[in-house]
From Swiss-Prot:
SUPFAM superfamilies: P-loop containing nucleoside triphosphate hydrolases. Keywords: ATP-binding, Nucleotide-binding. It comes from Methanothrix thermoacetophila (strain DSM 6194 / JCM 14653 / NBRC 101360 / PT). InterPro entries: NTP_hydrolase-rel (IPR022970), P-loop_NTPase (IPR027417). Belongs to the UPF0200 family. ATP binds at residues 8-15. Coiled coil: none annotated. GO terms for molecular function: ATP binding. This is UPF0200 protein Mthe_1012. Gene3D superfamilies: P-loop containing nucleotide triphosphate hydrolases (3.40.50.300). Disulfide bonds: none annotated. The keyword ATP-binding applies.
Length: 182
């Protein structure tokens, strides 16, 4: 199994990068979808606070790599898979341990651009409780508390998303083509 992981702070462009992978015919697994599905299963509203709580509980009860393990359940070992949203060093280590080839890419976007993008995308769990800037700071702090900094430090490559959407999509496409050939 070849795993290409995307790591980056909220609003950095991981979903756009994953869309490019899908367009290229690469299977994409979104780690946040595991948390959102578990929150739905528990009957919780789709808020950032609830998703954070569920993520915390899964990591506490099933181990730091719980979400990583869940997101690969039932996938073929022959596939190339993009994993969107790696958030900790434990998740990085899990993917390294199960993949024949593992590539970790940091998606970096300056904070002010992330804030604008989050405000524009309108996802239900982005902000339901007041000032978006404060909400993003809280979310960043929570994700850094999960070990996001360690995961970012483990990335072998950084793609800067400080350009137009088309330019960013092209940067992602070129990197994915290269990694799928290696």
């Amino acid at each position: 199994m070849r795993i290409i992981g995307f790591v980056g702070m909220p609003g950095s462009g991981k979903s756009v990068a994953s869309d490019v992978a899908r367009e290229m015919g690469i299977r994409v697994v979104v780690m946040g979808d595991v948390v959102r599905a578990e929150a739905r299963r528990r009957g919780l509203e789709p808020t950032d606070a609830n998703h954070g709580m569920v993520g915390d509980e899964l990591r506490r009860s099933e181990g730091e790599d719980a979400i990583a393990r869940r997101c690969l359940e039932g996938l073929s070992r022959d596939e190339t898979i993009v994993v969107d949203g790696i958030r900790s060093g434990a998740e990085v280590e899990y993917f390294r341990s199960v993949a024949d080839r593992f590539h970790l890419i940091e998606i970096f976007t300056p904070p002010e651009q992330r804030l604008r993008r989050i405000a524009a995308r309108g996802r239900s769990d982005d902000n339901n409780c007041g000032d978006l800037s404060e909400a993003l700071e809280r979310r960043d702090a929570r994700e850094l508390g999960w070990g996001m900094g360690e995961a970012i430090a483990a990335a072998g490559m950084r793609i800067c998303n400080d350009c137009t959407l088309d330019e960013f999509r092209e940067r992602i496409r070129v990197v994915l083509e290269e990694l799928c050939r290696s």
